[in-house]
Swiss-Prot record:
Component of the 30S ribosomal translation pre-initiation complex which assembles on the 30S ribosome in the order IF-2 and IF-3, IF-1 and N-formylmethionyl-tRNA(fMet); mRNA recruitment can occur at any time during PIC assembly. Signal peptide: none annotated. One of its GO terms (molecular function) is translation initiation factor activity. Keywords: Cytoplasm, Initiation factor, Protein biosynthesis, RNA-binding, rRNA-binding. This is Translation initiation factor IF-1.
Amino acid sequence: MAKEELIEMHGLVDEVLPDSRFRVTLDNGHKLVAYTSGKMRKNHIRILAGDQVSLELSPYDLSKGRITFRHIAGRGPGPAPRQSR
């Protein structure tokens, strides 16, 4: 499956499920089960209930998704600001 076939959506994490899965409600009200992407797992990015996330959905199965980004209020995508010592 090519990347251009994926559907990008935004949603809210309702519940943390076992095995690194999450129950997510999309902005349009659709509910699905999602898992974290490999880069998020590799960088130990924690996702909790109530977090705003971006997901990728396959057009073939809209009941499953992959979480690609966790949105933090007041901060956009990009590197974290460096703290001076």
